[in-house]
Structures are given as structure tokens and as C-alpha cells.
Design a protein with these regions (language model features):
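Acidic, surface-exposed loops and disordered segments
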Residues: 1-211
């Protein structure tokens, strides 16, 4: 299956087969794909919480507006954002760059200082929105990887983020819930599985600029 075929195959799964579990090796691929998600400036203000425990799923269901995907999916992926994105966070990222790429401080100092100044001048809301944008980059990446691996998924924005934070103890880790992605395998009873994919015609959404 090529990538376009995989994207044609996928859909927002509304009913998972609760008896089917995503194998550990595929979960590992999901982890790796998440960590390889490109982010603005390469700062990677993201974490991925993976929930397989049924008791936790049941608790999350109570704050997911009754969306049964939360309990029938094999795993629940919760993309989280850092709550403290400041000079220390940026400096820590650049220290990692120095270690991995074996570069001297003077090579990256000007860009690091630019970013520290830029983020210092941003409001908390601007930084929050920037981090949320990165979370959606990760979501798109995970949806594509799941499709390529023939894993069904359903992106969810309908949930009480504060309650998710509380149940998963994200505040203790300096994190907030951004978006939720149940993954697993579609139920044969999911009425949406056989429906044709609806997209606007390509000529309406894509155009070339020649001048």
C-alpha cells in the first residue's frame, strides 16, 4: 500500500474492536514517529502519554463527552505540551544540540540568544498557541504513520482537558493535554468504515503559482 492509498484507507474510526490490541512493535513505531515529528525551531515542546489501562480509560471516558472510542480503542495517545517554555527550556535544547552534533557554543549562540529574546517577548497566550500548533504537527504525523501501519485512529478535540490533566497527573510533570488520539482496529460494526471518503475536488484545493 503506497502512502496515498493508506490515506484513502484511513478514516476517523468511531467504533473500535475492543478485543484487538495494537502489537508492542507497532506501538514502538508510534513512539519513534512521535519523537521524530518536526517542530518549529526544533524545540520539541511535546510529550506523548500512552494509556492502555482499562481503569484509566474508564476515568477518561467520563470527561470525553461519552465518546466510546476512549474505552474500545487499544491505546489512547494523549499529546501534551510543556507549560514552562522559557530561557531554561531553550538553553536545555541547545545543550542537547551541542552534544549530538558536536558543535562549539559559538556556532549556535546567536540563534539561541535570538530565540530566548523572541520567546521572552511573547505573551503566555502566544507561547501556548505556538506549543499547540506543534501538537497538531505531531497529530498529523501520527495519523499518517498509523495509516501506513494499517492502524485505525480517531483524532479527538472533544474532551475536558483539565480533567485529563488531573487524571493523568500531568500538572506534576509540567504538562497540559493538547489533543487525544485513540488508536486500534476498527469494529466490523462501525457504520462509518464503509462510507466513501468525502473531500473537495483537488482542483478546488490545490493550485500552482507561476508568476
Amino acid at each position: 500500500m503506497d502512502m496515498v492509498e493508506a490515506l484513502q484507507w484511513r478514516y476517523a474510526t468511531k467504533e473500535f474492536d475492543a478485543q484487538k490490541v495494537v502489537p508492542a512493535e507497532k506501538v514502538e513505531k508510534i513512539k519513534q514517529a512521535f519523537n521524530l515529528t518536526p517542530t518549529s525551531y526544533g524545540l520539541q515542546p511535546l510529550h506523548l502519554a500512552i494509556i492502555h489501562n482499562n481503569d484509566l480509560k474508564q476515568k477518561l471516558l467520563a470527561h470525553s463527552y461519552g465518546q466510546k472510542q476512549v474505552i474500545t480503542a487499544s491505546h489512547i495517545l494523549v499529546i501534551c505540551i510543556e507549560t514552562q517554555i522559557d530561557s531554561h527550556f531553550i538553553e536545555k535544547n541547545f545543550e542537547l544540540q551541542k552534544q549530538v552534533r558536536v558543535v562549539e557554543d559559538n556556532v549556535i549562540a546567536s540563534f539561541r540568544d535570538f530565540l530566548i529574546k523572541d520567546f521572552t517577548n511573547r505573551t503566555d497566550q502566544e507561547i501556548y498557541q505556538w506549543a499547540m500548533n506543534q501538537a497538531y504537527l505531531a497529530l498529523g504525523n501520527l495519523l499518517t504513520v498509523c495509516a501506513a501501519e494499517k492502524i485505525d485512529a480517531c483524532p479527538m478535540e472533544g474532551f475536558e482537558a483539565g480533567k485529563y490533566d488531573e487524571i493523568l497527573k500531568l500538572n506534576e510533570k509540567g504538562l497540559k493535554t493538547a489533543v487525544v488520539l485513540p488508536v486500534g482496529y476498527r469494529s466490523e460494526h462501525d457504520k462509518f468504515a464503509g462510507m466513501k471518503k468525502v473531500r473537495r475536488p483537488l482542483e478546488e484545493t490545490v493550485f500552482e503559482v507561476t508568476v
